[in-house]
């Protein structure tokens, strides 16, 4: 079973092509014109062992908002498509990741019900030119388009780069765990018989 998807999204604001292979080796080829987002997506692929290719252009002369949000939309859609009927997946994943002085935890339930809990206090508003409020927008877009319940919690941290990086690494590891196929699971991991 090949769990792959390629999604293209073209609007007046962005042009995005994203290819994802869930059962990958962590290979990434990322070009979004948003360097900090490139770094986070590279981390997501590596720490989740997903193969990920993203080619994106957007109206970054205005700001990064549309590009970041739309990549979140497309990543959520790609995960959903690649998972298909979700038969045999563990459904739940959780990871806690330290990054120097920071500790971040992400829990994922690929339930079909989108809901984001985001308890992340960021000590400043920008990392270089990147508005850190866009991290929440990215996760919200993934949640809405994957149909998942995702809780992002930072227990403590001072360095904003470390905080965001720990969140993305924990997110990758939690999604990897939730998407793993377990041969003991018959159908889907739900008493309803459907996710």
Swiss-Prot record:
One of its GO terms (molecular function) is imidazoleglycerol-phosphate dehydratase activity. The keyword Amino-acid biosynthesis applies. It comes from the Bacteria. It catalyses: D-erythro-1-(imidazol-4-yl)glycerol 3-phosphate = 3-(imidazol-4-yl)-2-oxopropyl phosphate + H2O. Pathway: Amino-acid biosynthesis; L-histidine biosynthesis; L-histidine from 5-phospho-alpha-D-ribose 1-diphosphate: step 6/9. GO terms for cellular component: cytoplasm. Keywords: Amino-acid biosynthesis, Cytoplasm, Histidine biosynthesis, Lyase. InterPro entries: IGPD_sf (IPR038494), ImidazoleglycerolP_deHydtase (IPR000807), ImidazoleglycerP_deHydtase_CS (IPR020565), Ribosomal_Su5_D2-typ_SF (IPR020568). Its EC number is 4.2.1.19. It is found in: Cytoplasm. GO terms for biological process: L-histidine biosynthetic process. SUPFAM superfamilies: Ribosomal protein S5 domain 2-like. Belongs to the imidazoleglycerol-phosphate dehydratase family. This is Imidazoleglycerol-phosphate dehydratase. It comes from Geobacter sulfurreducens (strain ATCC 51573 / DSM 12127 / PCA). The gene is hisB.
